[in-house]
Amino acid sequence: MSGRSVRAETRSRAKDDIKKVMAAIEKVRKWEKKWVTVGDTSLRIFKWVPVTDSKEKEKSKSNSSAAREPNGFPSDASANSSLLLEFQDENSNQSSVSDVYQLKVDSSTNSSPSPQQSESLSPAHTSDFRTDDSQPPTLGQEILEEPSLPSSEVADEPPTLTKEEPVPLETQVVEEEEDSGAPPLKRFCVDQPTVPQTASES
């Protein structure tokens, strides 16, 4: 009997966890792919991370425009980490917890902001700026080639198709035979009854 109650408790906890995650996802409307360090290791993965809305950034910027931290970053970075903390749960996986830890470490240890980091915090430049270009992969990881367009344009714009003139099948087959340099392939016709007979004889 105790096994059933444990399973029921686990199911109810899982349902609660799902509700929390879904509520957090509802709050986050934008996601972007970033290179993220996993835990205390040097391993970096390319994964989706939540981005706060520009309205929320403007509100927090107007509230804390006079209150800047000594390292030059606005206190908006703490709002980002608190949003990610809401997204976390005690039973969540390790990499998402390390994301929050990495954000806190980045915002507290940088003494002078680079121009790229200051651009990423201002809401006016968020659409033009790509953070994955500023973070190269570490050893052992492949460099992924991406189109030069921002991710929002790539996702929204369907691929354009160009119409080519149809080439007759006979000329196409002749060109293939000439290009390959190999002897011509045997062609079987469905209309001829000799093909199944030769196959059955051998």
From Swiss-Prot:
GO terms for cellular component: chromatin; GBAF complex; nucleoplasm; SWI/SNF complex. The modification Phosphoserine is found at residues 114, 118, 120, 122, 127, 148, 152. Residues 107-123 have a biased composition (Low complexity). Residues 90-99 have a biased composition (Polar residues). It comes from the Eukaryota. Ubiquitous. Signal peptide: none annotated. One of its GO terms (molecular function) is actin binding. Residues 53-202 are annotated as: Disordered. GO terms for biological process: apoptotic process; cell differentiation; chromatin remodeling; negative regulation of cell differentiation; positive regulation of cell population proliferation; positive regulation of double-strand break repair; positive regulation of stem cell population maintenance; regulation of G0 to G1 transition. Keywords: Allergen, Apoptosis, Differentiation, Phosphoprotein, Williams-Beuren syndrome, Wnt signaling pathway. Belongs to the BCL7 family. It is linked to BCL7B is located in the Williams-Beuren syndrome (WBS) critical region. WBS results from a hemizygous deletion of several genes on chromosome 7q11.23, thought to arise as a consequence of unequal crossing over between highly homologous low-copy repeat sequences flanking the deleted region. Haploinsufficiency of BCL7B may be the cause of certain cardiovascular and musculo-skeletal abnormalities observed in the disease. Positive regulator of apoptosis. Plays a role in the Wnt signaling pathway, negatively regulating the expression of Wnt signaling components CTNNB1 and HMGA1. Involved in cell cycle progression, maintenance of the nuclear structure and stem cell differentiation. May play a role in lung tumor development or progression. This is B-cell CLL/lymphoma 7 protein family member B. It comes from Homo sapiens.
